[in-house]
Amino acid sequence: MSVEQFINDQLHSIVGISDRSICQYVHALAKKAKSAPDLVEKLRDAGDFPISPAIQSFADQLMSRMPRQATSARQRGPTTAELAEQELNRLNRAVGVLEDYSASSTKTKNVRKRKESSSEDDEAPIKASKPGKSVKPSKSDDSESDIEAMEAKLDADIAERDALAARINKKEKDKTRNVMEKKRDDNKDKEGSSMDKLREESRRQYLKKRKVDKLEELEAIVHDDQTLFAREKLTKREKADMEYRKKVLEYTKAHGKAGDVMKMKRYHLPDASTKQIPSQYVEDDEEDFRPGGDGAKWEEEQLMASMLHLGAKDAKRKEQEFELLLDEKVDFIQALQMPGTNEEVVETEAEKKKMSIEETRKSLPVYAFRDAFIEAVKEHQVLIIEGETGSGKTTQLPQYLYEAGFCEGGKRIGCTQPRRVAAMSVAARVADEVGCKLGTQVGYSIRFEDCTSEKTVLKYMTDGMLLREFLNEPDLASYSVMMIDEAHERTLHTDILFGLVKDIARFRKDLKLLISSATLDAEKFSSFFDDAPIFRIPGRRFPVDIYYTQAPEADYVDAAIVTIMQIHLTQPLPGDILVFLTGQEEIETVQEALMERSKALGSKIKELIPLPVYANLPSDLQAKIFEPTPKDARKVVLATNIAETSVTIDGINYVIDPGFSKQNSFDARSGVEHLHVVTISKAAANQRAGRAGRTGPGKCFRLYTAWAYKHELEEQPIPEIQRTNLGNVVLMLKSLGIHDLVHFDFLDPPPQETLVIALEQLYALGALNHRGELTKLGRRMAEFPCDPCMSKMIIASEKYECSEEIVTIAAMLSCNAAVFYRPKAQVIHADSARKGFWSPAGDHITLMNVYNKWQESSFSQRWCVENYVQHRTMKRARDVRDQLVGLLERVEIETKSSTDTIKIRKAITAGYFYNVSKLDNTGHYKTVKHKHTTHPHPNSCLFEETPRWVVYFELVFTSKEFMREMSEIESGWLLEVAPHYYKGRELEDATNKKMPKNKGKSGKDLER
């Protein structure tokens, strides 16, 4: 009986269960154990085997059957042959060369040396087989060799993984794309031209001054000639010189007055300091061409003279003024008032404008607690900060710590934000307050953009970027203070950071941790961080009246538009409006409707200025929401839930809350991730209402009933970690060396099922081995700031030699925005332009064609306009692609190009083989594994083609579950790229099978 057969029988009798993997696991433990008690200890550490006398007896019997030499009183040293064999085995493991027992019998076999405790004769080494003879291994030897080969292969992969990580860390400083370094290089290139301009300007200023000096000198000489030498006898030459100087002086003065005398139009260089042209060189406008000039007045007089006037009959009748009525109206009832916490005098916009930056900083509520805050940070390592949005905690607290000397020794102060917009806008504001250029002392770091330098001491970043910094700096050695801001939002990355920074704080006593929250759940954070103290900062909030609708609204978008017009017509100015919507599409719909209605009403209403703000909006357009509102106008800010806490907008007195937001949810059973519009929580509703009382008493109009608020809204939002796919997070934690994910210190642990699915997906992608350890492929995947499927697609492009095309496709997919746009007035032209890029291979190749054509046009904006392509989306795709190309070199992938679309689609399938659908006999697409019904997206170029097999980027749920960005593939490719995941019978195509050629029976035959 072989050893594994013995283990299998014993486990059935002792534990009641056994399979091949458990037998191999116990066999491997027995091989590593030195004795039976040692084996019992290893089984106890495994935790799956109850230690009992039966287990101890099993360990004794198993160790007696193991092929090993017994220890004796006289130990002999290894022979030369044994040393050579050991060295050969070591080298084979290092290079990954594994023995194959299924090879030809003519190969020499290394026979395993055995030891027996009872026989002295067996102490002699077993000789290796002679080259001419064949030794047939037993089943036990085959099993042992398979395990050894697998273990050696895993060890070699781990060694390669560690070597790759070391090389990546070594290249980190040189290969990271940095905005400030690029700017410095550009400045060096421009130094020569700028110096030339400065010299030219300096020369002009010198010539002006020299002209005045020389003129005064000449006047003095002429004056001396007239007074000193008028009565003297002079030579003919001296008289000519005096006459010459006199003429030069006259001509010079006449030249200076030439512009005034002749009124000649000529170019004059403006003054360098004021940039204004002197008044004596500005010509008067001709009045005949001005409204109200002499010509216009003459025309009015002639027209009046030609018309018949009847005296009092022509007098203007005073029209009766009526109140402007709207066709639609939303009825509200006032339910309650949110009390204020600070009854300060409301400052006007003019008064705020007069305030300097320093005065503005001192006017914030947090300024009164500056000294107490610094003392609290010095006294405690972890501090929970509770302060309302607008109190100044995000912009001021890092500055206070910097001024208190927490950046000494080259350390930094970091502050995380859940959104890119918040990180960029806050960093820009702090840079203005510090008085430096953005990217020097104050910088930011977001996905695909790093605006920092070696001088940066205050660094704002997204929480995802701080997670990526853990890969290269697991102990955050360059930071003295780390502030996790907006902790109440409970984003996926923020929850992971809680566990990581809590662990770091235990062995880095010099690291200060600040956890900032804007809601009243600070006690939960305090208890998670070992009862850390809470530092409360009272906000500056005024009373807010809460209004609910009398009945539920069927269309909250239309109700929001009507409510905006109601407020604008009935509420006094000044007072801006903040509207919370779910996404870019709704924001653009409301913006367009407001512009149309304002245009239709014309001068009957005051000016209404709709301003959008969402993540994909360019920063220059986002900044418009912070600009002062013009006089006799009202600003309407259309925002996503980013305006709840991340951004503070002054001048808001009215808030419209439809009660909805977009939220990701992951279905663990089907493996599908949805983006749903869901109701907000009560905590979020109160945050939205509080925005109306930021600068003065305000009103909040909730587009739902008071009953719905009380019974349908949850108290707190569900943390993102409990409702999203954890594949990227698990890969990141594995890269950081955190293997026990079940016992990881989560603030709210994720569902066990979701965690298991993430591990299964990473194992299927090849990022993890069967021991749950990160592979070399997984370490390379972790370097890309993408989801695991996209990272695998990029790495698979190395095999198919099409990395240039794959990074282009990945960049276009990463933008999360529409590439094409369809103006309502030009729908036919827009659709025709889009079809010009279509490829029969699918949407992925179509996206690649769009980028390549734009690149051929030298990245022209005009080309985008002519082809109805979003220029903003294309610019972002170019930035993403540039960084992905840099990361290819970092993970040692050579950039190659290929025009073969089959290779490109195979690389896509290698990453997204999870997302494969098959057309069934009913004409519907169903996923291969879960038989989940999906539908082609109407904007897909394959919408009318219906290929048999397709791979898609993601599922988007609106009215149905649509496949976004799909491409046609062949079923055989799945066995090529994922033979471990798909079986041949799953990929059989029933349409290709022929029916048997059997003849049917006639009616007469049936009657018989």
Swiss-Prot record:
ATP binds at G387, E388, T389, G390, S391, G392, K393, T394. SMART domains: DEXDc (SM00487), HA2 (SM00847), HELICc (SM00490). It catalyses: ATP + H2O = ADP + phosphate + H(+). One of its GO terms (biological process) is embryonic body morphogenesis. GO terms for molecular function: ATP binding; ATP hydrolysis activity; helicase activity; RNA binding; RNA helicase activity. SUPFAM superfamilies: P-loop containing nucleoside triphosphate hydrolases (SSF52540). Pfam families: DEAD, HA2_C, HA2_N, Helicase_C, OB_NTP_bind. The keyword Repressor does not apply. Residues 104-146, 169-202, 988-1008 are annotated as: Disordered. It is found in: Nucleus. ATP-binding RNA helicase involved in pre-mRNA splicing. Operates during embryogenesis. This is Probable pre-mRNA-splicing factor ATP-dependent RNA helicase mog-4. It comes from Caenorhabditis elegans. The gene is mog-4.
